Amino acid sequence: LLVKEDAPVYAACIGLYLFLEKRQYLWGGAVFLFSCLYFTSAVWFLDHFGDGAMINRFDSYISDESYGLLSMFKTILVDPAYVLAQILTPDKILFLLQMLLPLGFLPLMSLRLGKWVLLIPFVLINLMSNYKYQHSIFFQYTYGSGALLFYLAMVNFRDLKLPIFRQLRSLFLGSGLFCAVALVLTV
């Protein structure tokens, strides 16, 4: 993972989670800052001593090539409808269902911002990329975001407090088990 320029994205989001949700300001801030520093160092290293970071997977978001990835963040802030149109394609919707349906959509069942930051890698790395293998469950690109989704599912399942959610717990478990078995049997 030391040569993967996307690994710090996962770590930075975990740092934000620690900072915002767990109130571990020192550790969360340190993990976030170190991850950002490592990311910029890895991209610089790849640009100067390798073939460069694979930002071409995000070409549809880069409006000004001279700014590189910074231009991508401008596109996200200025034109969120365009970003949604790029994310909500049929193959990415199928991928979204393949990732979230076995988890009963539990990773999405929270109103706490600190938990939602763990969804950033899933959206950024998997759904926003135009590289078809990054939004396919049959390739390694889902390892990091899948682990974060699984963690969120467990934490949100534990935190379900409303009576209706308590009654639906067995339904969540059953649907997750059914989807997991169906997925394994089709592979």
Q: Where do the language-model regions lie?
A:
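Membrane-embedded alpha-helical segments of multi-pass membrane proteins
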Residues: V3-A12, L96, L100, Q140-Y141, ...
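Signature aromatic-anchored transmembrane alpha helix within multi-pass, membrane-resident enzymes
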Residues: F32-C36, L160-V187
